[in-house]
């Protein structure tokens, strides 16, 4: 009987180890062909986009100039502009597990506290100086890490951690960031709490934030139009 229990235990451990690669996978799935240019008009989506026929994909899918110039940093109250280059904007990165953003900041502009649930982020400041802040999980006591990053310097944001960038300089600033996902996703914390559709019930936020209903309603009014 003892031998039987030991054998059963060994089988369980082997099966568990076989699943380990699945459990620890933290990036997009590996590609199974040289390229798979996304067909953004296809109605077929299986955790990604269907491929265009190879004959319909010219070499232009390898190149993009969309982040060569930035947008209007004064177009929103944040004082920043994000030029996205994910699979929706650059179909050539479909299945390749990469994407990029360019972010331009007015003096005092911010990329508000947010999370990328599906990707690690690495970035370089091209001009100006940015305060980069990262907030750890409850495991670290919600520790706050920060540093002023200047032109030519780099930073990394672990996957899923809340973070922000803030232009502490007197001139405009620009950074370029890359992700290990074709679609890293983004969750803006203020917009998520106060601009969700439909809205989060006010009593929930009153209890969670420990403020009165008037404060919650005021904050909701600030995000009715999104960012």
Swiss-Prot record:
Q: Domain of life of the organism in this record?
A: Eukaryota
Q: Which Pfam family, giving just one, matches this sequence?
A: Cupin_1
Which cellular compartments is it found in? Answer: Secreted, Extracellular space, Apoplast
Q: Where does Mn(2+) bind?
A: 114, 116, 121, 163
**Main localization of the protein?**
secreted
Name the family the entry cites.
Belongs to the germin family.
Q: What is this protein called?
A: Germin-like protein 3-5
- Organism expressing this protein natively: Oryza sativa subsp. japonica (Rice)
């Amino acid at each position: 009987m003892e031998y039987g229990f030991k054998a059963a235990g060994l089988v369980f451990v082997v099966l568990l180890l076989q699943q380990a690669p699945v459990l620890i996978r933290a990036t997009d799935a590996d590609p199974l062909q040289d390229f798979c240019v996304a067909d953004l008009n296809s109605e077929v989506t299986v955790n990604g986009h269907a491929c265009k026929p190879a004959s319909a994909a010219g070499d232009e899918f390898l190149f993009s100039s969309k982040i060569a110039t930035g947008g209007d940093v004064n177009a929103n109250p944040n004082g920043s502009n994000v030029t996205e280059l994910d699979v929706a904007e650059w179909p050539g990165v479909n299945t390749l597990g990469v994407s990029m953003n360019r972010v331009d900041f007015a003096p005092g502009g911010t990329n508000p506290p947010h999370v990328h649930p599906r990707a690690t982020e690495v970035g370089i400041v091209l001009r100006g100086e940015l305060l980069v802040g990262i907030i750890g999980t409850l495991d670290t006591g919600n520790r706050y890490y920060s540093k002023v990053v200047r032109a030519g310097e780099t930073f990394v944001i672990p996957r899923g951690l809340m973070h922000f960038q803030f232009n502490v300089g007197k001139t405009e600033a620009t950074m370029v960031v890359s992700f290990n996902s074709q679609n890293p996703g983004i969750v803006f914390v203020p917009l998520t709490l106060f601009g969700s559709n439909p809205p989060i019930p006010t009593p929930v936020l009153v209890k969670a934030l420990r403020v009165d209903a008037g404060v919650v309603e005021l904050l909701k009014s600030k995000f009715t139009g999104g960012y």
